[in-house]
Amino acid sequence: TFMILADADEPLITHIPGFDGYLTVRFNTNAEIWRDREIFRYHPSFIDAIEVQYPTSPAESFVLKVANKDQVSIANGKGEMVKGNVNADFLRSYLDSYMNIQYENIIQLAPSTRDSVLVPQNLLATITVVNKEGAQKSIQIFKRYWNGRAFVNKGTEVEFDQDRVFVVINQKVVANGQYRTFNKLIVRYQDFTNPPIQPKN
């Protein structure tokens, strides 16, 4: 396979050791394939605030304000501060989850398709992260539905994909994402508190 570098006068023979065949498939010219799949990559010390909103369960929504790794305030969807003991291990693990969140691939939806699948009743959560410099990134997570196409789960047809979701990044880019990735982020306000200590008999 011949390849020519930018500003080069002559092409070069390109070889991958152990590979026999055309290299075209290894060097795709579609820019979306080469695009960084990063959505969130924040060390906890660079996070100023995280807001997670659940349209169908506002009581489970929450806002985290991060002063530093040892000082994080937690409020519910009504702005009420957390009551009870904070589960520090869970909180620390949750903040660490934002260090590496990626989508699977970019998808192009026709306007008619977009209007029928990215609908309010399919919206699972909206997550907004603000860094220490005030820059904001927001995503919307939708149940993955495709115009009546049936998904199969353990031999049974279901309306929504059980493995993947649609992710809308900054209200522009639409991507496929995996539940196993985003389940780390879509936790409940109540998960940040330790269960009450039961008195000993």
What are the residue ranges of the model-derived segments?
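Soluble, acidic/polar mature domains that operate outside membranes
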Residues: T1-N201
